[in-house]
Amino acid sequence: MDRWYRNWQHPAHAVQFDGRAHLDLRNLIRNYEAFNDVRLLNERVERSRAFELLEVGCATGEFIRYLRAKFPLVHYIGLDVSEPAIARAKAKYPEVPFFVVQADSNLTETLRDLGVTRQPDTVYSKDVVQHQVRPFEFLSSLIEVASEAVILRCRTRDVGTTVLDPERSCQFYEGDWLPYIVLNLQELVEWVRAKVPEGEIVLYRHHMVLGGQHGRFLPKELYRKETGTAETAVGIFKQTERPGTVMIYDQPEQNSTGTWDYRMRSAVRKAMKVLRSSP
């Protein structure tokens, strides 16, 4: 396996990325709907229709619980490079098709090899693009397999070109480095338009300084507010009444605080933990 993807095989990864499994359904919905990518999904996909959704980067599979609650007719497939994460997803939802895939595999060929005969209507990929060695090519693969739409969440910058070298733009995680690539927004738009010239592109930017957080080792300009870094939701719609349009909105993501009873239970658990650790 490429050294940039070894981190995802650490057993702790499945534990760290399974936090939503402990949320009840109300708080799970609140958590997901705080993000702009899920907002786009709800705005553009009819809840009453049956549709195929492929999630690329499904981790431990909790998104299926949200989808079943909000889109009861969804037909879902989840893919991830992490064997521990997929093992956890299968343990929780054995009836759901979850698959381990290779990071450098061709997505179209992978789906064919897995026996997926129908092209997914929607491809969804949350916080995966920035961890790719070749993020633009990865984006192209998502576009190619979707029949109707791609919805994703990535990292962007308004000022300065994309730094594609993962040695210069990376993140320390579970004892090793992984890519953390921040795409220039205009480069991103132009790449998508070249692939889907008649498509509609919608972007929701949540501006924030990306440098200096979560073990990231990034180019110096990404530590400055004026660079305009953001966590950005991207909707690419192949079937649309607004072909060829690009709409960019500044849309701060919400803080998911949880219901009052959930917050109370969390406070009690934290207090008990402190008491147990006291001498």
Predicted regions and their residues:
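Conserved acidic residues
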Residues: 51, 121, 148
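A short SAM/SAH-binding and catalytic strip from SAM-dependent methyltransferases
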Residues: 121-133
